[in-house]
Each structure stands twice: as structure tokens, then as C-alpha cells.
From Swiss-Prot:
It comes from Deinococcus radiodurans (strain ATCC 13939 / DSM 20539 / JCM 16871 / CCUG 27074 / LMG 4051 / NBRC 15346 / NCIMB 9279 / VKM B-1422 / R1). InterPro entries: Ribosomal_uL16 (IPR047873), Ribosomal_uL16_bact-type (IPR000114), Ribosomal_uL16_CS (IPR020798), Ribosomal_uL16_dom (IPR016180), Ribosomal_uL16_sf (IPR036920). Belongs to the universal ribosomal protein uL16 family. SUPFAM superfamilies: Ribosomal protein L16p/L10e. Binds the 5S and 23S rRNAs and is also seen to make contacts with the A and P site tRNAs. Interacts with A site tRNA mimics, and is probably one of the key factors, along with a helix of the 23S rRNA, in positioning tRNA stems in the peptidyl-transferase center. This is Large ribosomal subunit protein uL16. The gene is rplP. One of its GO terms (cellular component) is cytosolic large ribosomal subunit.
């Protein structure tokens, strides 16, 4: 699973997910991309599940680019713990994804293969997604 090697601070505020993606909103490396249509926190294990299902679908060919990285720690207090006594321990890591953000890209595969791989990967994610080509990414937003 993905997580940062080290961070400046161990814990973060939750923050807000307003507006569209500020960067990473176009297909930069591959031929096809999977973009988010709504805001969400994407966990590192969800990213890994998408990577596995896409690589299994492609078998030998194709290159997968993961364009998001889980750099935000999410904390959780133990069960049946009274309030107070500080913020809980880091439970998992998430990537803050806003609408229009390209999450995955693929290269070296046909359009049908990419479409099916992104459909399978989309089922692993908690948000609506859409496939875009390298040339016509503007029309999807």
C-alpha cells in the first residue's frame, strides 16, 4: 500500500473538498485516463485494488500510471474510548480527489481494453468516474 516515507507533521485536520481539481486534470502520460466526477477521499488500499484489477485485466501488456498519492493521514480513536485525551492514532492514508482529477492513466492498450479496465477499477472506488482519451479530455468535464 502507498504511504509517505516521512511527513513534516504526523496528523492533519480533515479539511474541506470544495471546488474542482486544481491540477492533474488532463491526461499527461498515457493514452487514456480515468477521471473523478465527484469529490472523495480515496484510501491507499482502494488505489492498490484498482492497480491490481487493471494489471490483471491487461495480463502482460500495457503500462499503468497512478496519478494520485495518499499523503493525508486519517486518525481514529479506539472503540469505547471516552472523549478527550488527544487526537487518535493514524489509522490509514487517503488522497483528496476533487472532480476532474485524473486518477489513473494507461498506455499501450486498445480502447476496448482500457474501457473495460477502467470499468473494473471504477467498481473499486467510492465515486463516479469517467474514461477520457488523451485528445478529448475537455469534453468530459
Amino acid at each position: 500500500m502507498l504511504l509517505p516515507k516521512r511527513t513534516k507533521f504526523r496528523k492533519q485536520f480533515r479539511g474541506r473538498m470544495t471546488g474542482d481539481a486544481k491540477g492533474g486534470d488532463y491526461v499527461a502520460f498515457g493514452d487514456y485516463g480515468l477521471i473523478a466526477m465527484e469529490p472523495a477521499w480515496i484510501k491507499s488500499n482502494q488505489i492498490e485494488a484498482c492497480r491490481i484489477v487493471m494489471s490483471r485485466h491487461f495480463r502482460r501488456g500495457g503500462k499503468i500510471y497512478i496519478r494520485i498519492f495518499p499523503d493525508k493521514p486519517v486518525t481514529k480513536k479506539p472503540a469505547e474510548t471516552r472523549m478527550g485525551k488527544g487526537k487518535g492514532a493514524v489509522e490509514y492514508w487517503v488522497s483528496v480527489v476533487k472532480p476532474g482529477r485524473v486518477m489513473f492513466e494507461v498506455a499501450g492498450v486498445t480502447e476496448e481494453q482500457a474501457k473495460e479496465a477502467f470499468r473494473l477499477a471504477g467498481h473499486k472506488l467510492p465515486i463516479q468516474t469517467k474514461m477520457v482519451k488523451r485528445e478529448v479530455y475537455d469534453e468530459a468535464q
